[in-house]
Amino acid sequence: MTKRVLISVSDKAGIVEFAQELKKLGWEIISTGGTKVALDNAGVDTIAIDDVTGFPEMMDGRVKTLHPNIHGGLLARRDLDSHLEAAKDNKIELIDLVVVNLYPFKETILKPDVTYADAVENIDIGGPSMLRSAAKNHASVTVVVDPADYAVVLDELAANGETSYETRQRLAAKVFRHTAAYDALIAKYFTAQVGESKPEKLTLTYDLKQPMRYGENPQQDADFYQKALPTDYSIASAKQLNGKELSFNNIRDADAAIRIIRDFKDSPTVVALKHMNPCGIGQADDIETAWEYAYESDPVSIFGGIVVLNREVDAATAEKMHGVFLEIIIAPSYTDEALAILINKKKNLRILALPFNAQEASEVEAEYTGVVGGLLVQNQDVVKESPADWQVVTKRQPTETEATALEFAWKAIKYVKSNGIIVTNDHMTLGVGPGQTNRVASVRLAIDQAKDRLDGAVLASDAFFPFADNVEEIAKAGIKAIIQPGGSVRDQESIEAADKYGLTMVFTGVRHFRH
């Protein structure tokens, strides 16, 4: 009995060659629309879909394969006489292979000028229906949705006259993943169109970007997936120019670092990060000086860290950086000389380029945190703040220099693990106290790291001070200016302590917990 294949593809890469090989193996080819035209023009004999259905393609191609003669040929079980008799009685010929890929819905909605009507017209109906019918009946039918699978199917057909059950099952699984992802994108698009912020069902779709050797630890399996609708300003979209593949921990740290530097876009800034916490942030009039400040913030912790710069890396900056062991450098661009310096000196240094012109688009993305049996979803902590909205709650007002330093410190504290404390001046971090289970311990840790650089320093806290003992510790160290959200039932005690020691303290009214 002659084998039949139905081919209907929007991505025509390799389809002519695939069809030609099937013809050599004696297969009969049914085809639709533009696919049939492409095959006919290449000299591949095909049967029109309307010759199979008895109905013409209609309604601008919306209806062409939704017919019992197609789906009966796909769904009939070859091991059930009743199915085969029903097919024979209704003059339905069996279809043994389906090659379908779908209307380019994703590519359509990514176009900057896409209209709602364009998006709707690129929702495929017949294609997913054929794919699902064939995949359901994979015991008898081979289904191909990915051109990358053409070769393995041809090899098995040439060698054995049919594909193996294992191959059919694997291809069916790929189809169901593919159609689920396709529908998820459509659901996401329509959900956004109607402004639904809390849908009762949430389906996320990601594409495998990189299999990983292991996860956070060697005993943990891991892979890296990228959003199906990519975000330009993200570690997943960065272009790697040198070095080994990024590890699981590299990716998490790099993501944290590029989030930080979004808040410092107005001036040349360098962020150094280790284990998801900033260990140095430097800001200056030029990127070379900003690097020096970031390095001097903590010359010990930066060893083996990740550095992100928000300006092009020049040769002078590269010369200074290459003397420090770093895991990753990320910048918008590099001069040819700078890149040569970094690569020649550090063959394994991971160097990435990430354009910073899409930062604001990245801020609207939701954050997903997995818990056992569930998923937490929240907006990113990107609230727009202005010093004009802050309140000086002490008798003493900040000096101009202190005000600048407090603003710098407040940007930085958002990214320190809670309970988080940071000590800075107006252009660099001096001490970081992350992740302690009581706030006064974080205060002591940050102050101890800043040590003899406390003259003129300020301190920021990611949340309110529950007791005045924090202010006592700060005053004892000689720090004269504090910024914190406020909001404790004991705020007045902290204010009185600050006044007692002649400190200035600013309340922002916004908490920045980070877990």
Swiss-Prot record:
* KW Amino-acid biosynthesis (keyword) present: no
- Please give the positions of the paired cysteines in each disulfide bond: none
Pathway as given in its UniProt record:
Purine metabolism; IMP biosynthesis via de novo pathway; 5-formamido-1-(5-phospho-D-ribosyl)imidazole-4-carboxamide from 5-amino-1-(5-phospho-D-ribosyl)imidazole-4-carboxamide (10-formyl THF route): step 1/1; Purine metabolism; IMP biosynthesis via de novo pathway; IMP from 5-formamido-1-(5-phospho-D-ribosyl)imidazole-4-carboxamide: step 1/1
> Which molecular function terms from Gene Ontology are attached?
IMP cyclohydrolase activity; phosphoribosylaminoimidazolecarboxamide formyltransferase activity
What is catalyzed by this enzyme? (6R)-10-formyltetrahydrofolate + 5-amino-1-(5-phospho-beta-D-ribosyl)imidazole-4-carboxamide = 5-formamido-1-(5-phospho-D-ribosyl)imidazole-4-carboxamide + (6S)-5,6,7,8-tetrahydrofolate; IMP + H2O = 5-formamido-1-(5-phospho-D-ribosyl)imidazole-4-carboxamide
Which key words tag this protein in UniProt?
Answer: Hydrolase, Multifunctional enzyme, Purine biosynthesis, Transferase
**What are its GO cellular component terms?**
cytosol
Q: Which GO terms describe its biological process?
A: 'de novo' IMP biosynthetic process
InterPro entries named among the record's database cross-references: AICAR_Tfase_dup_dom_sf, Cytidine_deaminase-like, MGS-like_dom, MGS-like_dom_sf, PurH-like
What are the MGS-like domain coordinates in residue numbering?
A: 1-145
Q: What is its EC number?
A: 2.1.2.3, 3.5.4.10
NCBIfam families found in the cross-reference section: PRK00881.1 (NF002049), purH (TIGR00355)
Q: Which family does it belong to?
A: Belongs to the PurH family.
Q: What is this protein called?
A: Bifunctional purine biosynthesis protein PurH
Q: What is the organism field in this record? A: Streptococcus pneumoniae (strain P1031)
